[in-house]
From Swiss-Prot:
Enzyme Commission number(s) from the entry: 6.3.5.-
Gene: gatB
Keyword Nucleotide-binding: yes
Biological role stated in the UniProt entry: Allows the formation of correctly charged Asn-tRNA(Asn) or Gln-tRNA(Gln) through the transamidation of misacylated Asp-tRNA(Asn) or Glu-tRNA(Gln) in organisms which lack either or both of asparaginyl-tRNA or glutaminyl-tRNA synthetases. The reaction takes place in the presence of glutamine and ATP through an activated phospho-Asp-tRNA(Asn) or phospho-Glu-tRNA(Gln).
Matches recorded under PANTHER family: GLUTAMYL-TRNA GLN AMIDOTRANSFERASE SUBUNIT B MITOCHONDRIAL AND PROKARYOTIC PET112-RELATED, GLUTAMYL-TRNA(GLN) AMIDOTRANSFERASE SUBUNIT B, MITOCHONDRIAL
Protein name from the UniProt record: Aspartyl/glutamyl-tRNA(Asn/Gln) amidotransferase subunit B
């Protein structure tokens, strides 16, 4: 591939994402079968999702609620009148030979999502990505190919219809994205929003969040878009970024060598780190959409819309802005704290229990985060409650214990030991009448070091401080010890 650094200034990429989010309802969109992941193949099925004769779909009201809340969170206009349509196509994973989706009257459209990237200095760069539309639809089944990850090259294929009829919202962005990094951040922010709302778990490994990328390149300054290529089969955020970066280079190289870019669907191959051609891209006319005759149109009342709007939580971007402006936290800390709703809830509970916000942020984003990563735990699984973290921070700030003592006891605190028991009998010695004789004793016991210090080796002050801490089992107040040692050495 041509090095991207020699051509990025001459070309720009035009990128949009189509994201399917599986909604966290207990039952399917048009029937009562379970949506539970991991069930034995073809056990969560029923006559409706299998398209058997004589049955009719009935809309799951929770799907409409979740779709509207997602649309509101993405700053969309909610349609007062909407409907479902049949999308016709033939594939083994589609038992009815059509999918119930929405075409010309989606439930939500014309919104935006703010993304935030940090520069090398940690300063946030924010950008709004337009949302073209959000619509409801049912998922298809899942093909399992023996001997390959797709039909080509497999010895046989099996179909699991458990996923057929699982509710989805498809969110289509405007072509406002320019880089793979922006695309990956957009997808991550979208997942954060869905998780904060509680409408989707966004687990990519379970297929709850699936992204397709539409990408073209054009010379900088040209208004007309280039030929669009769709990329599928990206199963992680890093794969989204890498697939886009590869495809940008591929298209630029093709243009500069005189090749014509064709409108097609390509697959991202994780193993070879490249995209390969899958099929020519279909247009909407290929699907022969028409209104779904078995479902009534949808009307959302002002009262219902107002109720759902009032139930929206504070969203990730709103929290980041508040943490920075009101609590004085860095952009990096706010990103870590808002990445997962349970982390932000823990942080806010610690503050409510009296913790200094900056100190709480430091403990959560550094020491506690390192423990969680090492143990592969979530913050909800640790034994250190927010109230106990606040207790530890208060003990440090009031001089009862040192930061070093707290870090030494952290592993036990994280497994449930209370601060009272952890620091029993370990309060810092800050009484001059107790500390001064210990300092005098240490200085008297090290005459050679004292002579070297007074001859100009002032770095030896740390030696004397260390000896005092050692003698007191690290219970000597560090600040007071430093002041007292310096006074005695220079006396």
């Amino acid at each position: 591939m041509t090095s991207a650094t020699t051509v990025k200034t001459e070309y720009e990429a035009i990128i949009g994402l189509e994201t399917h989010c599986q909604l966290s309802t207990n039952t399917k969109i048009f029937s009562s079968s379970s949506t539970a992941f991991g069930a034995d193949p073809n056990t969560n099925i029923d006559p409706v999702c299998m398209g058997l004769p004589g049955v009719l779909p009935v809309l799951n009201e929770k799907v409409l609620e979740y779709a509207v809340k997602a649309g509101l969170a993405l700053n969309c206009q909610i349609a007062k009148y909407s409907k479902f349509d049949r999308k016709q196509y033939f594939y083994p994973d589609l038992p009815k030979n059509y999918q119930i989706s929405q075409y010309d009257l989606p439930i939500a459209e014309h919104g935006w999502l703010e993304i935030e990237l940090l520069d090398a200095e940690g300063n946030p760069k924010r950008k709004r990505i337009g949302i073209t539309r959000l619509h409801m639809e049912e998922d298809a089944g899942k093909l399992v190919h023996a001997g390959s990850d797709r039909i080509s090259g497999s010895t046989y294929s099996l179909v699991d219809y458990n996923r057929a009829g699982v509710p989805l919202v498809e969110i289509v962005s405007e072509p406002d994205i320019r880089t793979g990094q922006e695309a990956a951040e957009y997808a991550q922010e979208l997942r954060r929003v869905m998780r904060y709302l509680g409408v989707s778990d966004g687990n990519m490994q379970e297929g709850s969040l699936r992204c397709d990328v539409n990408i073209s390149v054009r010379p900088v300054g040209q208004e007309k878009f280039g030929t669009k290529v769709e990329i599928k089969n990206m199963n992680s955020f890093s794969a989204i970024q890498k697939a886009i970066e590869h495809e940008i280079e591929r298209q630029i190289e093709a243009i500069e060598s005189g090749e014509k870019i064709i409108q097609e669907t390509r697959l991202w191959e994780e193993g070879s780190q490249r995209t390969i051609s899958m099929r020519t891209k279909e247009g909407s006319s290929d699907y022969r959409y028409f209104p779904e005759p078995d479902l009534a149109p949808i009307e959302v009342s002002e009262a219902q819309l107002s109720q759902w709007r009032g139930e929206l939580p504070e969203l990730p971007a709103q929290k980041r802005h508040r943490y920075e402006s009101e609590l004085g936290l860095s952009a990096y800390d706010t990103r870590v704290l808002t990445e997962d709703v349970t982390v932000s809830q823990y942080f806010e509970a610690a503050i409510a229990s009296g913790a200094n916000p900056k100190a709480a942020a430091n403990w959560i984003t550094q020491d506690i985060a390192a423990y969680l990563n090492k143990q592969k735990l979530s913050i909800a699984e640790i034994g250190l409650t927010p109230a106990n973290l606040a207790d530890v921070i208060t003990r440090i700030e009031t001089g009862k214990i040192s930061n070093a003592q707290a870090k030494q006891k952290l592993p036990e605190l994280l497994t449930g030991l209370s601060p009272e028991k952890a620091f029993a009998g370990q309060e810092l010695i800050s009484d001059l009448s107790v500390l001064e004789p210990i300092v005098d004793e240490v200085i008297a016991a090290n005459p050679k070091e004292l002579e070297k210090y007074r001859n100009g080796n002032i770095n030896l002050k740390g030696f004397f401080v260390g000896q005092v801490l050692k003698k007191t089992n690290k219970r000597a107040d560090p600040k007071l010890t430093n002041e007292l040692v310096e006074k005695k050495l220079n006396g």
